[in-house]
């Protein structure tokens, strides 16, 4: 059974609420947008994985992070269980590091 975490990362940007989305730069998902996330490392707890993904994507640690919802049985080629977390970060503290596989972008929440 595969388990992954997804972190819904919010910030206030130019006076409005924004969420971090990742544009996939490599196949097979090139051009698609996704929430930051990934699979657990062996022996890693859910909370530790969510904190790792938050820091990997934003450079931020020690912020509000809470488990939000768990999805299961998502279909072939996907994790069997996806645990979603909610984070609220200070935009001024973030350090985005795009690479050849993904490009982060803050998108307004309407």
Across the structure, where does each feature detected by a protein language model lie?
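N-terminal strand-loop-strand
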Residues: 1-34
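Active-site segment of metal-dependent pyrophosphate-handling enzymes
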Residues: 1-5, 18, 47-110
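Acidic-residue sensor for enzyme active/binding pockets
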Residues: 23, 44, 57
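Active-site donor-binding loop signature of nucleotide-sugar glycosyltransferases
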Residues: 24, 37, 109
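Short active-site-proximal "capping" loops at secondary-structure junctions
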Residues: 25-28, 40, 70-73
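Short histidine-centered catalytic/ligand-binding loop motif
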Residues: 35-43
């Amino acid at each position: 059974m595969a388990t992954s975490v997804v972190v819904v990362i919010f910030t206030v940007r130019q006076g409005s609420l924004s969420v971090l989305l990742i544009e996939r730069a490599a196949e097979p998902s090139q051009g698609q947008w996704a929430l930051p996330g990934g699979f657990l490392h062996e022996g890693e707890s859910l909370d530790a994985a969510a904190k790792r993904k938050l820091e990997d994507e934003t450079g931020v640690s020690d912020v509000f992070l809470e488990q939000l919802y768990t999805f299961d049985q998502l279909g072939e080629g996907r994790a069997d269980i996806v645990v979603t977390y909610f984070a609220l970060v200070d935009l001024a503290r973030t350090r985005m590091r795009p690479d050849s596989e993904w490009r982060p972008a803050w998108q307004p929440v309407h």
